[in-house]
């Protein structure tokens, strides 16, 4: 079963999202235990609302649970946000559902995907092929949109409390670094932006900094604050480059 911290937000501007978020998070999690197909239906409906309302400065988060659980209050307030994350998502799964938001008109689409592929034993070659197709399809569907590929984050398997700790232990963070370099190369070839978050999250041993994670895989509030700061800085730099 999959859960969503924010509940079924549909689509609202940042201000409205904050007001929608005053209910007990625990109650929301219990209320919204959904399977994968149910999540697809929810995201399709949310994207439909965004496509109909056509809000200004729309940005989309596309990915897995790391994107899904991004605290709404930490997202840059200069934008309207549509969260298209699903817990446990893989690059292949994301590729198959890009059409869910193909009628929206976002300014930016931020993509982070891949850690669940590694956990499931999917080869780097397949991951890279999926990334290549994701970038190509997003460029075709959204020719006027800036596509931003974000690096796969490291993990902290040694001290992980996540239930799949053994699977994390089998994934060297050095492999993630190498995979990120190849993803960046594909992004460069396709004319897609690449946002390297990886250095912000690693310690001297190349692992996910312990204060930035809740269980060795998922992010803590501090972790999301680091990510949020990177998005803020990126947005400011992009805005400055257009002035």
What residues fall within each predicted segment?
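Conserved beta-strand elements of the Class I
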Residues: 58-62, 82
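Oxyanion-hole/transition-state-stabilizing segment in secreted/luminal serine hydrolases
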Residues: 68-76, 92-129, 154-160
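Active-site segments of SGNH/GDSL-like serine hydrolases
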Residues: 115-116, 139-173
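Generic structural signal for well-ordered alpha-helices
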Residues: 98, 131-135, 180
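Catalytic His-Asp segment of secreted/periplasmic serine-dependent ester chemistry enzymes
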Residues: 157-243
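Acidic/histidine-rich helix-loop elements
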Residues: 33-35, 78-91, 167, 216
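N-terminal secretory targeting modules
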Residues: 1-58, 72
């Amino acid at each position: 079963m999959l859960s969503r911290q924010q509940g079924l937000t549909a689509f609202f501007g940042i201000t409205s999202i904050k007001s929608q978020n005053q209910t007990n998070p625990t109650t929301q999690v219990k209320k919204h235990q959904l399977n994968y197909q149910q999540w697809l239906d929810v995201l399709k409906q949310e994207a439909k609302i965004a496509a109909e309302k056509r809000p200004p400065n729309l940005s989309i988060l596309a990915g897995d649970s790391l994107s899904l659980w991004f605290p709404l209050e930490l997202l840059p307030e200069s934008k309207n946000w549509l969260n298209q994350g699903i817990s446990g998502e893989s690059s292949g799964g994301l590729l198959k559902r890009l059409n869910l938001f193909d009628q929206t008109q976002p300014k930016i689409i931020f993509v982070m995907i891949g850690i669940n592929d590694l956990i499931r034993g999917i080869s780097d070659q397949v991951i890279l092929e999926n990334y290549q197709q994701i970038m190509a399809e997003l460029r075709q569907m959204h020719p006027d949109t800036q596509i931003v590929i974000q690096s796969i984050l490291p993990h902290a398997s040694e001290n992980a409390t996540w239930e799949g700790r053994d699977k994390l232990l089998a994934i060297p963070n050095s492999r993630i670094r190498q995979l990120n370099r190849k993803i960046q190369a594909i992004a460069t070839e396709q004319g897609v932006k690449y946002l390297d978050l990886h250095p912000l999250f690693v310690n001297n041993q190349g692992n996910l900094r312990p204060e930035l994670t809740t269980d060795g895989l998922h992010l803590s509030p501090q972790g999301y604050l680091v990510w949020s700061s990177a998005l803020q800085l990126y947005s400011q730099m992009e805005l400055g480059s257009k002035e």
